A protein has these predicted regions:
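N-terminal targeting/anchoring "stem" of glycan-biosynthesis enzymes
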Residues: 2-593
Length: 593
């Protein structure tokens, strides 16, 4: 029993000891847990401070890098960099950039909603030049032993105006006209006679009811007549001829009017204007060889394309030098053209900016190309170019050829053998260009010379075929600023500025008007349309206004080229002396064509 109690006490003691041990271990474990938690708290606080320190250091480094990037200059632009920049500009169309690549010229002319090759209004107008019942025929009014001789002046087309006006002057003076003499001594140095360029028989026969015309001056009782040589002022009207030339003609029987170009006023009575048209558009035709060769050139252009443009391009060194225009060629251009300009000792010092601002500078080949593209003509269009020597040669023509690769001339579509009968004579070569330009679907010019004016009038008379003359006064600023705008903006402005310069019917002629350019008296309208007087809106240029415009707005067609280098201006005053006893030099269109 005692042994059992003893064992029971030992068991109870053992249990108590294990319990105390567990309690002690629990305390130790709790303490270790508290210690671990405390250590974790300490470590978290330490880590936060480290991260704060690292963040502060990183922020300082970022600030330093930003300051460095702002204050350091940009790297030098390389060609590769600029090329990449331009490609970005092309994609985003950044208008503010001044780089040329912003001004992208399309290859297509676009769809402008109008017909490029004709006018939809032309069918309502037609040429009409028949004489009225009041117009006396030649057999009733021509006086016997009264002969008028004419010496023309300038290039082919300037001489053409003289021939046309000579017929009218003969009618005014009731005189017999002797076939006019062509100019063999001007800048062009062409020895061709009238019969070698124009059809004499047709000229005489078709005008037989209007004016008596002889090929040669007849002899006076077996002796040769001695004509009185005279010179009349520019724009001389009917009264001028009747009061100043007719008395001399009655006394001497034969009068020769020299330097006869633009010697007849634009303002004549309607029957005289219609006579001008009968001469120009029906009687004055080229010889058969010229017409046949011209027909061959036209057929070859038609074989290349259904429609084609004819461009009369005047950009000769002499003409540019005289005009005083500057085209950006630097000292080389100034030196070369300046040396040529010294031929004319009386020329004043040029102001290129003023000349161009007034619209007196011919457009460059590139500018003509840009204008045509803006008007809707794409790169697939074929162009026949009538031109002389182009200043700068192929380098000057390159931009135009890039815009219109289908670039032709009589030299490229005809052989040397075919052109041989004409190539030694500037007048006959000019006649070939005249024929092709006249038959083209669209005629374009970069100048306001004689050929441009003559053909503009002819194309109006025969159906108002499109004839594009650049509005140089407006376009010059546009060409200067073209790199500061998009192509669409440029093209829109070109089309706006060219309104009234496209050869459309009812165009109001801006500024002065040459009758040969706008033969309004010879253009009639179909029934149901307003009369020609009404369509002019009552605008009429008086004699005084005409004279003022001639003096205030001269161009190179009013310039006299003299072998001695002298130049003089003749005032267009109908009261100036008719005769020129001392042979003083006067105006002649050196830059006539």
């Amino acid at each position: 029993m005692l042994l059992m109690l003893k064992n029971l006490n030992q068991l109870i003691f053992s249990v108590r000891m294990k319990k105390k041990k567990r309690e002690r271990n629990s305390i130790l474990l709790q303490g270790s847990n508290d210690l671990f938690i405390g250590l974790n708290v300490i470590l978290c606080r330490k880590r936060h401070r480290v991260f704060s320190f690292i963040s502060a250091v990183s922020g300082c480094l970022l600030l330093l890098l930003f300051a460095f990037s702002v204050l350091t200059p940009p790297p030098t632009a390389t060609d590769h960099f600029l090329a990449h920049h331009f490609s970005v500009v092309r994609k985003t169309q950044v208008v503010e950039s001044n780089f040329d690549e912003v001004f992208q010229v399309p290859t297509s002319g676009g769809n402008l909603g109008r017909h490029l090759w004709s006018s939809n209004q032309s069918k309502f107008y037609y040429g009409c030049s028949n004489a009225s019942k009041r117009f006396q025929s030649a057999d009733l009014k021509t006086h016997p032993n009264r002969y008028l001789m004419i010496a023309t002046s300038g290039g082919l087309n300037q001489q053409r105006t003289g021939i046309i006006d000579a017929v009218v002057v003969a009618y005014i003076l009731n005189a017999t006209l002797v076939i006019p003499k062509l100019d063999h001594h001007s800048y062009w140095k062409d020895t061709s006679d009238f019969a070698e360029i124009f059809n004499v028989d047709l000229f005489i026969s078709s005008l037989s009811r209007d004016v008596e015309i002889l090929e040669e001056l007849p002899r006076n009782g077996g002796k040769a007549w001695v004509p009185r040589s005279m010179r009349v002022p520019r724009k001389c009207n009917s009264k001028c001829y009747q009061s100043r030339v007719l008395p001399v003609l009655n006394k001497r029987d034969v009068v020769e009017l020299t330097k006869f170009d633009y010697r007849l006023s634009n303002r004549l009575e309607t029957d005289l204007q219609k006579l001008r048209c009968r001469v120009n558009y029906h009687a004055l035709r080229f010889t058969d060889p010229i017409l046949e060769m011209g027909k061959i050139l036209i057929e070859r252009m038609r074989m290349k394309a259904k429609h084609f443009i004819a461009l009369h391009l005047r950009f000769e060194p002499d003409m540019l030098a005289f005009s005083g225009c500057y085209y950006g060629g630097g000292e080389k251009e100034r030196g070369e053209l300046g040396a040529i300009r010294k031929r004319w000792k009386t020329l004043h010092v040029s102001n290129p900016e003023k000349v161009r601002r007034h619209g007196r500078c011919p457009l460059t080949p590139e500018e003509i190309g840009l204008m045509l593209r803006a008007l809707g003509f794409g790169s697939d269009v074929h162009i026949y170019v009538a031109s002389g020597e182009v200043y700068g040669g192929e380098e000057t023509l390159a931009p135009l050829k890039a815009l219109f690769p289908n670039f032709h001339s009589k030299e490229t579509i005809a052989s040397k053998e075919e052109l041989a009968p004409f190539s030694a004579f500037s007048g006959r070569m000019a006649a070939l260009d005249y024929v092709v330009c006249d038959e083209s679907d669209v005629f374009v010019t970069n100048n306001n010379g004689n050929m441009a004016r003559i053909l503009a009038g002819r194309r109006r008379y025969f159906g108002h075929r499109p004839t594009i003359r650049p509005n140089t006064k407006k376009l010059y600023k546009l060409f200067l600023d073209r790199n500061n705008m998009t192509w669409d903006e440029f093209a829109s402005k070109v089309r706006t500025y060219q309104i009234g310069y496209m050869g459309e019917p009812k165009e109001v002629k801006p500024g002065r008007g040459e009758f040969h350019e706008n033969p309004d008296s010879c253009i009639c309208e179909t029934k149901g349309l307003e009369s020609s007087q009404e369509r002019n809106d009552g605008v009429e240029v008086s004699d005084e206004q005409e004279q003022q415009s001639l003096q205030s707005d001269p161009d190179w067609t009013d310039i006299d080229y003299l072998d001695t280098g002298g130049l003089s201006k003749e005032l267009p005053n109908a009261d100036s002396s008719v005769s020129n006893k001392h042979g003083q030099p006067e105006v002649e269109a050196f830059f006539s064509d």
